[in-house]
Regions:
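Peripheral, non-AAA+ core regions of ATP-driven protein-machinery
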Residues: 1-147
């Protein structure tokens, strides 16, 4: 099953919208990140696997390919990747994904950690016509500055 979500990448004081594509198949095993991720994004694989296991979710028996459409850096892609995987697994509804941007780092126990650059991400989400920006609670006040 194919699903796409949105994330954002901060460059200076600006942000760009990043499409996160997730494809889930029954054959093969593993989580593969493609699309020029940096080391922090590549490490998302281990954080996401641990978060899934520690919250009772299983990816075993499935091949998950995640494509990021621009060169990316930072751990803020954990949440959009995890949401995309959950939607592809039909664990969460994908209904709101086309109008939502996600940003957040996952800890190994599945809780969200704050990320940097939420203000430019909120501006970008608004400018792109997205209706929601989902961020960790610690980033909510910063994101709420943008209407």
């Amino acid at each position: 099953m194919f699903v796409s979500t949105y994330a954002g990448a901060v460059a200076g004081i600006d942000a760009v919208k990043v499409t996160v594509e997730v494809n889930l198949t029954g054959g093969g095993l593993g989580l593969y990140l493609v699309g020029l991720p940096d080391n922090a994004v590549k490490e998302s694989e281990q954080r996401i696997r641990a978060a899934f296991e520690n919250t009772g979710r299983k990816m075993s028996g499935r091949k998950v390919v995640v494509n990021l459409d621009l060169r990316k850096e930072g751990a803020g892609f954990d949440l959009p990747i995890a949401v995309g995987i959950l939607a592809a697994m039909s664990e969460v509804s994908g209904e709101l994904l086309p109008t939502t941007m996600f940003a957040g780092e996952l800890s190994l126990d599945g809780t969200l950690r704050p990320v940097r650059g939420v203000l430019p991400l909120a501006v970008k989400a608004r400018d792109e016509g997205l209706r929601r920006l989902v961020v960790p609670a610690e980033n909510a006040a910063e994101a709420a500055v943008v209407e």
